[in-house]
Amino acid sequence: ELLELPLVERSQKILGALIGEELPKATLDEMVKNAFTFTAPLEKVEDNIYALELFHGPTLAFKDFGGRFMAQALAAVRGDGKITILTATSGDTGAAVAHAFYGLENINVVILYPKGKISPLQEKLFCTLGGNIRTVAINADFDACQALVKQAFDDVELRQTIGLNSANSINISRLLAQVCYYFEAVAQLPKEKRDNVVVSVPSGNFGNLTAGLIAKTLGLPIKRFVASTNANDTVPRYLKSGNWDPKTTVATLSNAMDVS
């Protein structure tokens, strides 16, 4: 059974099923092995409540899973062409992407982030590497950074000239990798508790939740999801009212979720 396999072997099978013949099996298996070099322990908090620890990667962020696999994937498919990764970050994406792509040949990374609105540790994690990693502090909030990224992707000539690509959650390779740790969470539960699982997901851009929904669609026995947000609650308000009405982003202690 899939849930009885170790993380890497299980993830190779999951991603192999999702990616199909787009990559040779041996190549994909090696990519997963190189990307998932750390664990995601499921720790019991109290009766029937568990926490999946996704901070054991090199930048202490859950996005290490997606970032490292995405770097492996782009390196495998780019051929002889050069790629420029342009991404906006509210903290954890920048660190994970910078470390995942650092030193990869013919891949440059440009990271936009809101000045003064991410933790000092996160800023040091991606602003001190140099090499093929470039960072730009924007005197605005995360949504303004994301708007600049979207504007760049709307420029067809720019996309073609520099081989523009994204490391945000619009890049499916990142989400596919994140699917794997939902399986890992359920696999670590006692067998008698695997049939009635409710997963609470901290949500900013809702990419992590999307990965969970993909896992459920693949057959993972998850009963339902809880999307946990902070004061930046555009999506919950939309689900209640049907009106899409983003507000000015509020700075909170959970800065990686500060997305309007």
Residue ranges and their predicted role:
Residues 1-260:
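PLP-dependent amino-acid enzyme catalytic core
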